[in-house]
Amino acid sequence: MTKDQNGTWEMESNENFEGYMKALDIDFATRKIAVRLTQTKIIVQDGDNFKTKTNSTFRNYDLDFTVGVEFDEHTKGLDGRNVKTLVTWEGNTLVCVQKGEKENRGWKQWVEGDKLYLELTCGDQVCRQVFKKK
């Protein structure tokens, strides 16, 4: 595993995305559209500074952060909530905690070989996404 997450990553699999979205109270119609989409992630990393773009034909979401620095995040590309977000390193894995009205919310992201792994959590729901480097 490596800490380097730079690159363009295309989605290969998206397990339990609907369950994750239900836990976020995302409406039925949006969930039905979103589960059929393929996402592309573009990550520009300079040490602990990240600029990320998640693109699909339905919605795009940009997130810029510095590891270890808490910030206010508006999750407009997903459920439209305001959360306090902190991303840290655990070994070579980025671990994000999002504090707000939903319990146990956040994500983990790491690279192994030419694959980017992302686990999204809300409540008791975990979505597992795998991306391949383009």
From Swiss-Prot:
Its main location: cytoplasm. One of its GO terms (biological process) is retinoid metabolic process. Keywords: Cytoplasm, Retinol-binding, Transport, Vitamin A. Gene3D superfamilies: 2.40.128.20. All-trans-retinol binds at K41, Q109. CDD domains: CRBP2 (cd19463). It is found in: Cytoplasm. The keyword Cytoplasm applies. One of its GO terms (cellular component) is cytosol. InterPro entries: Calycin (IPR012674), Fatty_acid-bd (IPR000463), ILBP (IPR031259), Lipocln_cytosolic_FA-bd_dom (IPR000566). One of its GO terms (molecular function) is lipid binding. Intracellular transport of retinol. Forms a beta-barrel structure that accommodates hydrophobic ligands in its interior. Belongs to the calycin superfamily. Fatty-acid binding protein (FABP) family. This is Retinol-binding protein 2. It comes from Rattus norvegicus (Rat).
